[in-house]
Amino acid sequence: MKKLFFSFVFMLLPLMAMAQQSVPAFKFGYFSYDKVLHAMADYATATRSYNDLKAKYDAETKRSVEDFNSRYEDFLDVQRKLEPSILRKRQAELEELMDRNIAFRKESERLLKKAEEDIYAPVHAKLNNAVRQMGKESGYAFILNADNNSVPFVNTAMGEDVTEALIAALK
């Protein structure tokens, strides 16, 4: 039994040695997501679109604040001359206007956040698809996002910076 076992092990040794020699080289890529994203023409277009929308909301917010301020100043000018019932009515109107302004501001922030996600989603999808495609074509095991000091060390013998290649591919 021992002879059979040892002969089997000796037959497997050359196979195991060949298997270790044929291990493919492990390689990966890394890039700066922000640098590539900001270099994309689609990102500039999306940013302009978002900024236009934000400017419209900001203008409406400014208009409503100015309207409230002018009404409040008018109220302060005539406050001492008003009857108590009219005074309470005007105060209630101002409070309601202020509450509506606060509600509008919160709603506009929510809508702007959603619009930002919707506007930039196709840009992020395009970049992610390009990264995926480059990884497949170049045979990378994975591609890392090196922003925010998330990858403090990269061995350049094993990893390759694909930032410029991605920028070129997305133009």
Question: What spans do the regions from the language model cover?
Answer:
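Bacterial Sec-dependent N-terminal signal peptides
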Residues: 1-23
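Amphipathic, charged alpha-helical segments and their helix-to-coil junctions
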Residues: 20-171
